[in-house]
Amino acid sequence: METEAEVIPIWQNKPHGSTRSVVRRIGSTLPLKPCPRACFQELPGLPSMRSLDGPLVPTLADIAWIADDEEETYARVRSDTRPLRHEWRPTPLLVMHRNSSVPNFRREGRRVEGLRKPGVTALNRTTALQDELSRLRAQIAKIVAADSDSNPITPDLLSPDDTSMGFSMAPFETAAYQPPPTASFVISDVTEEDEEEEEEEDREEEEEDVSELVPDPMPPVSMTASATFDLDRPTMDFREPEEDTVSLSKSTSFADVMDMLKDMNRLKMSKDRYNRGCTSLREEDSASLISEALRKKFVLKDDDISMRK
């Protein structure tokens, strides 16, 4: 008896049952066997680094435990035991290095926090430098005020014009009318100050006579060194001829700091103008005293260079 296999076309298959999918029909005919499970075998000679009390399979509880491990760069589970830090050496089978692309947020947070906090040493050093600077400024102001009271030598610092600030250089103009160049002196070392003071007393009478005959020239406007100061401008009625004259030396040592400090001690407003209240310069204001002395020095230097030209 012949049996003929019934062929059922695919388009006539039912949407359910054993003929629903071609994959099911192939799987029912092919002898498929499951793959064998992987088995791990402990190597002889390795130290026992796992405790029998805890679970051997890592779980989600190990994640927080690994995150708390700050001193090691590799991950390990809770069951790892380390007798001594200097004796324990991880084997290649257990070491899992940290991926370099994954950032370590714990270390980054500490580094950023350290950068945000200012250094206590740097703050203390800055405060000490500021205190030292204030003390030096006060000492220089006291020296300038003391020397200026004993030796008032200054040119006319105020201009009659209210719109421009300049300086009157009458001593340089009067030097042309004097036969010998005795109307000026040269700023030199401190050892020659006594001789210069004696010569200045002899010249005061001659300078007063000549300065009254010659009018003051127009004051220059340019300055090579700028300083912050506050001066009251007197009118023409209160202008009086200066009694002292100043002439800078022709040497090239004006840029030297020592020469600048020596000249600062010898420059000051005249006593008449200071008594009349024509200036708001105060002795206790060290910055104003220093800026005033530097202003006089550099203006006199510029005028001396222009006269030589």
Swiss-Prot record:
Membrane-crossing residue ranges in chain numbering: none
Annotated membrane topology: Peripheral membrane protein
GO annotation terms (biological process): aerobic respiration; mitochondrial fission
Modification type Phosphoserine: residues: S253
Keywords, ordered alphabetically: Membrane, Mitochondrion, Mitochondrion outer membrane, Phosphoprotein
Ranges of Acidic residues composition bias in the record: 190-211
UniProt-annotated stretches for the region Disordered: 189-221
Pfam family membership, one: Mito_fiss_reg
InterPro entries hit by this protein: Mtfr1 (IPR007972)
Superkingdom, natural source: Eukaryota
GO cellular component annotations of the record: mitochondrial outer membrane; mitochondrion
General function of this protein: Mitochondrial protein required for adaptation of miochondrial dynamics to metabolic changes. Regulates mitochondrial morphology at steady state and mediates AMPK-dependent stress-induced mitochondrial fragmentation via the control of OPA1 levels.
Family membership: Belongs to the MTFR1 family.
Protein name per the record: Mitochondrial fission regulator 1-like
